[in-house]
């Protein structure tokens, strides 16, 4: 049966089971949802929608028909008339494709009203579905640009969703000899260019598609694998916004991919920021990049954000559920339910199985699980990291001692994740009087932090409590100063004042952190603190390993040696990855316990060591694939 025939059957069922007074205008597949356009959406109660979803076994979305929506400018005025001024509305975002209007205000409770009465009044007056959110304390240019693109290209986005929907809902007959295999196109026995290719007789799914920024000759996944074909690809899933997991996604669109990208909303925004930053840095350094800014926009238009815990059809036989991974904002464990109860596979991406200042720990309970693919960054026997409190004390000690002697502290960080964790520690240390110096934020850190403030529901309970109930937002502290230009960076470097500098990139592979290192390295009163993983071959690993001189390429393309006289520290307790103890604890706590466990995302020796330990401790089948290996899991 074709997708059109499937849709026609669904349309008839919905019309038959829906109240006539709802006045159904159209029923369409849009991405993973069946969208019902009606003239009177308020007729559809939650009970009716749940009943339809259960009977049809599809996600049902009820939307107002565009013909009944009040013009946005008039709608704004009506909302302002209904909502009390004390709510302090700051912005409206109208989404014509969903019929929603996001209402940003400083007091969203007043937009909702007692028992939701104000929301009901808004809905009746404008017919749009109001979605009240708290005004982000720092405005994000990335989110603004994404919203503008989706609004401007709304007709194209709708067509994209309908095309994707028809592909997802095509009718498939599941064979008796149904098989499932996973090919490892990158990130096996290495850290960088993570890329898994899941194949079944009827579906092809890519999970992550990263770039190894530290190694030019092994930068991209193995798209030359004989089984891989971009034309056959049904879906791409992104676990989180770090370049080694999402850096190549726009390149897929450049080379012919035209399907969906699934991830959480924060991941969509953060990966867009990272990809743009990667382009800009590569351009400045004269490096080739496999895509353009136009491809990043195309990627945004094809991205379908899904929330944690929401099960979504991504093909006729595969359902995807994303769960919190605890690694960075919006990071996810991808759980695939394949066939009707046939097989369940989960890929952790990068996980942190511990509550951090910023995030809750990774989820370890699933409805069903036969195979787990898990990261092994810190999987070796001696990969036991210090306690976080100990790491925080050590960080503040080094910062205090260095600034007291008039030095500058450079902390190279990933713009997403570690930077925000460190901001929280430094803000607390500054408030306690442990050090008295400004903290400069360079690279994309300020913008990444703005995106964090837009998604408070993804932060830890403690952070939400601080921001919403205690009125204390650490990200807005006076200690933080934004470095927004080359001139401002120059002033920080030339100034005699002691300070702390958080700058990207975290492994000194490019960006402002390298620029600061050039100028701070010769002076022994300065210090550099490594707080994240330094991959083999990176400048960060060389400095960390004790090199006394490092080669730096100048702007005119010549190589110059820089002496390393500054103090070098490594403080490991801030990693966003689980250490060996946490990885073992995670496997012990997994419910249900999987039959097979596959180790990836770690140096070869660490993957092998971790696999051997898990095999002995838990009596499980373990695998340590190499790149280009394929494992048949079913």
Swiss-Prot record:
Activity control, as annotated, is: Optimal NaCl concentration is 100 mM for nuclease activity on RNA.
Where on this chain does Zn(2+) 2 bind?
Answer: 244-245, 350, 601
What are the boundaries of the region KHa? Answer: 4-69
Where are the annotated segments for Metallo-beta-lactamase N-terminus?
Answer: 179-381
The alphabetical list of record keywords is: DNA-binding, Endonuclease, Exonuclease, Hydrolase, Metal-binding, Nuclease, RNA-binding, Transcription, Transcription regulation, Transcription termination, Zinc
The record's listing under InterPro entries reads: aCPSF1, Beta_Casp, KH_dom, KH_dom-like_a/b, KH_dom_type_2, MBL, Metallo-B-lactamas, RibonucZ/Hydroxyglut_hydro
Report the Pfam families cross-referenced here.
Beta-Casp, KH_2, KH_TffA, Lactamase_B, RMMBL
- Entry GO MF terms: DNA binding; exonuclease activity; metal ion binding; RNA binding; RNA endonuclease activity
Q: How does activity depend on temperature?
A: Optimum temperature is 60 degrees Celsius for nuclease activity on RNA.
Region listing for KHb, in residue ranges = 70-137
Signal sequence, renumbered to the chain: none
* Location of the region described as Metallo-beta-lactamase C-terminus in the Swiss-Prot/TrEMBL record: 576-634
EC number in record: 3.1.-.-
Gene Ontology annotations of biological process type: DNA-templated transcription termination
The free-text note explaining how the cofactor binds reads: Binds 2 Zn(2+) ions, which are required for nuclease activity.
Q: Which family does it belong to?
A: Belongs to the metallo-beta-lactamase superfamily. RNA-metabolizing metallo-beta-lactamase-like family. FttA subfamily.
Its assembly, as annotated, is: Homodimer. Interacts with RNA polymerase (RNAP), interacts with the Spt4-Spt5 complex.
What NCBIfam families does its record include? arCOG00543
Give the protein's function: Terminates transcription on the whole genome. Termination is linked to FttA-mediated RNA cleavage and does not require NTP hydrolysis. Cleaves endonucleolytically at the RNA exit channel of RNA polymerase (RNAP); the 5'-3' exonuclease activity of this protein degrades the nascent RNA released from RNAP.
PANTHER family per record: CLEAVAGE AND POLYADENYLATION SPECIFICITY FACTOR (PTHR11203:SF51), CLEAVAGE AND POLYADENYLATION SPECIFICITY FACTOR FAMILY MEMBER (PTHR11203)
What this protein is called in its record is: Transcription termination factor FttA
Gene expressing this chain: fttA
């Amino acid at each position: 049966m074709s997708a059109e025939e499937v849709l026609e059957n669904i349309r008839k069922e919905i019309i038959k089971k829906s109240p006539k007074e709802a006045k159904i205008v159209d029923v369409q597949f849009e991405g993973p949802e069946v969208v019902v356009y009606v003239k009177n959406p308020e007729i559809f109660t939650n009970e009716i929608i749940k009943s339809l979803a259960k009977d049809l076994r599809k996600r049902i979305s009820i939307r107002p028909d565009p013909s009944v929506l009040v013009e946005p400018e008039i709608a704004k005025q009506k909302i302002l008339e209904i909502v009390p001024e004390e709510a302090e509305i700051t912005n409206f975002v109208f989404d014509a494709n969903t019929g929603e209007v996001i209402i940003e205000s400083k007091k969203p409770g007043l937009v909702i009203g007692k028992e939701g009465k104000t929301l009901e009044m808004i809905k009746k007056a404008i017919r749009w579905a109001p979605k009240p959110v708290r005004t982000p304390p720092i405005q994000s240019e990335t989110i603004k640009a994404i919203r503008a693109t989706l609004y401007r290209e709304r007709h194209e986005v709708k067509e994209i969703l309908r095309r994707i929907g028809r592909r997802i809902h095509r009718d498939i007959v599941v064979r008796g000899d149904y098989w499932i295999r996973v090919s490892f196109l990158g990130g096996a026995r290495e850290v960088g260019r993570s890329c898994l290719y899941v194949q079944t007789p009827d579906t092809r799914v890519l999970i992550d598609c990263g770039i190894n920024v530290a190694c030019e000759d092994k930068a991209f996944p193995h798209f030359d694998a004989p089984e891989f074909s971009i034309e056959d690809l049904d879906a791409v899933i992104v676990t989180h916004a770090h370049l080694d997991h999402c850096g190549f996604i726009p390149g897929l669109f450049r080379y012919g991919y035209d399907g969906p990208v699934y991830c959480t909303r924060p991941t969509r925004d953060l990966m867009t920021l990272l990809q743009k930053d990667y382009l800009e840095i590569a351009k400045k350094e004269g490096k080739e990049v496999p895509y353009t800014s136009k491809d990043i926009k195309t990627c945004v238009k094809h991205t379908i954000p899904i929330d944690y815990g929401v099960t979504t059809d991504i093909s006729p036989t595969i359902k995807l559920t994303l769960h919190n991974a605890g690694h960075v904002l919006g990071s996810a464990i991808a759980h695939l339910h394949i066939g009707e109860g046939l097989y369940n596979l989960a890929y952790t991406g990068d996980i942190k199985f511990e509550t951090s200042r910023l995030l809750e720990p990774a989820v370890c309970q699933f409805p069903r699980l036969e195979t787990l693919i898990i990261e092994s960054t810190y999987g070796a026997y001696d990969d036991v990291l210090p306690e976080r409190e100990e790491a925080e004390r050590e960080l503040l000690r080094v910062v205090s001692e260095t600034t007291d002697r008039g030095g500058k502290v450079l902390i190279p960080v990933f713009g997403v994740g570690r930077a925000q964790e460190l901001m929280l520690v430094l803000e607390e240390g500054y408030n306690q009087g442990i050090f008295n110096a400004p903290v400069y934020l360079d690279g994309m850190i300020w913008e990444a932090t703005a995106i964090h403030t837009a998604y408070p529901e993804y932060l830890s309970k403690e952070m939400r409590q601080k921001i919403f109930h205690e009125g204390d937002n650490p990200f807005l502290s006076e200690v933080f100063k934004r470095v927004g230009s080359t001139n401002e960076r120059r002033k920080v470097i030339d100034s005699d004042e002691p300070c702390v500098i958080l700058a990207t990139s975290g492994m000194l592979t490019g960006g402002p952190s390298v620029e600061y290192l050039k100028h701070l390295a010769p002076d022994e009163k300065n210090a550099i603190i490594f707080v994240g993983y330094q991959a083999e071959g990176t400048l960060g690993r060389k400095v960390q390993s004790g090199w006394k001189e490092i080669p730096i390429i100048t702007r005119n393309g010549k190589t110059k040696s820089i002496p390393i006289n500054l103090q070098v520290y490594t403080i490991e307790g801030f990693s966003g990855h689980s250490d060996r103890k946490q990885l073992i604890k995670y496997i012990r706590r997994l419910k249900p316990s999987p039959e097979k466990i596959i180790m990836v995302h770690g140096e070869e020796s660490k993957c092998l060591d971790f696999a051997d330990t898990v095999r002995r401790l838990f009596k499980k089948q373990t695998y340590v694939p190499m790149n280009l290996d394929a494992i048949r899991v079913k």
